[in-house]
Amino acid sequence: REDGNVKIAPDILIFQAKCHSAKCNHEYRSKIPNSAIALFEKFTVANARSGTITYSMNILEVSTTPFTDQKPGTSGLRKAVKVFQQPHYLENFVQSIFDSLEGCQGQTLALGGDGRYYNRKAIQIILKMAAANGFSRIKVGHRGILSTPATSCIIRQYKTLGGIILSASHNPGRPEGDFGIKYNISNGGPAPEKVTEAIYARSKVIDAYKILEASDVDLDKLGTFKLGAMTVEVIDSVADY
């Protein structure tokens, strides 16, 4: 119901969406059984008065609180693996990146890392967050591997919005070592101070992040896959470079 005044049973989720019609700014709420999520990614309800309303059923908006230590430098954000493994830590920073960009809807992003510990887990999280934030396509390195120069090449060659690189450079890896994440802009180069400051500013006030509830992508298989409405291309890590 539009007023959101519904009685919620334990197996019911509430979904909210804005009408797509330019003439209508109403927000709509709908209750959908969890069992329906397994069958559909989206459904539309035709309404002659207000147009078509699309509900993305498996996008979660997770409440969070800021961390005080997420100020990136030109080499991105580098911390101990155990810091990144804290609940919401990586997600907060990734959402801060997305919120700082000039529109993610319909954009393409490059993604990969140097293969250190936590690389694969982080990539799966970022893929699902990218899908939830409206990216249309992600080019991710085979097995999650993509060096900084190779990522820069992918960004320029395919004119992506930018790229996320998971690397802590010469810092040691392994569970007791370090992990890192940085954003490169559309020219393939590191994010300038204006961008990193915007990311940091957002990280200090963030209160929620979006993530798709979905199975992991098979990073070991080259090819094209769907993750919600987003296309994931698992590409050869060095061919274009």
Regions found by a protein language model. Name each.
Residues N58-F67, A80, H88, G177-Y241:
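Gly/Ser/Thr-enriched, mixed-charge loops and adjacent short helices
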Residues Y55-M129, A229-Y241:
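An N-terminal, well-structured beta->alpha segment
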